[in-house]
């Protein structure tokens, strides 16, 4: 009689080992799926919404500075081209508007006319390479009173918010060894197209922030982000009260923002998602109100009868008219949320300046408890 096991016994052992191996793999997959599910449920997903140029992407940059590792030297260097383009777009737009405004604006110094011709004829080229004379012409034009007067009328045409900031810094940016600082990165304007996700952690709590384009043709992409959102952060540019849309020169920007907020607030798919309202660009709003050239009442007649509310917080050095203006804009949004609120979602307003890191740090810290409560309610833990 042989001393080896039968072939049937061997096959049975192999099958048994395969079954054990398959079960181990299956158990490992199940454990991983359970971990992923727990991580997903523990993550706060924040959707940034708002009209174009409201400051959404700047908020995302602040989250990177505050809660990730900021921007590497390589990333900063990569931003130089965008910053130079901001300078070019700014001086091109301002000098181009001088003749199209009604009434038009003349240069203070006639000898600057060739500089304007250079900017309009050469700097507009798609493959423009920013030679030294470009910076020289730009610096001299930025000193011209006619150019400055045209800048002050920028609500009459389309100009990027960061125009003055970068035109003031041309002498630094033209340096071959220039590296952007954090404020340069925050101020740099690049059109957002598509959906961008930023992940960060605060006190061991995971956040995913989704930034989507705000122009009208970008908004159809928003619906892709609505699934399982913890909260919406709606960003509005308060300083846009005297401006019109790039994509529709007949529509006031702040009214567009109010209409957009109303459509989101009343959307049947979002009835259980609360909105954190960032009343942004408070610095620019204050500048405009103090200058007195574009009165809020000229664009919103309701402001004439508006009284500063009793809950307004005012410091000793605050301008009463600026306070009245910012609370008026706040209350225009709250009027929408209270008119159709059903108790299932709420609006939490905050005054923000997206380029001010300390301001955004404080505001986001104030919002974290609200977001946590929304998250617990989302998974019926509250």
Curated annotation (Swiss-Prot):
Q: Where is the lipid attached (N-palmitoyl glycine)?
A: 2
Name the Gene Ontology molecular function terms of this record: G protein-coupled receptor binding; G-protein beta/gamma-subunit complex binding; GTP binding; GTPase activity; metal ion binding
Indicate the segments forming the G-alpha domain, all copies: 42-382
Give the start-end ranges of region G1 motif: 45-58
Please list every transmembrane segment annotated in the UniProt record, as residue ranges: none
Chain spans, region Disordered: 1-31
Q: Where is the composition biased (Polar residues)?
A: 1-14
Q: Where is this region: G4 motif?
A: 276-283
Which GO BP terms apply?
A: adenylate cyclase-activating dopamine receptor signaling pathway; chemical synaptic transmission; imaginal disc-derived wing morphogenesis; neuromuscular junction development; sensory perception of chemical stimulus
Protein name per its UniProtKB record: Guanine nucleotide-binding protein G(s) subunit alpha
Please name the gene that encodes this protein: G-salpha60A
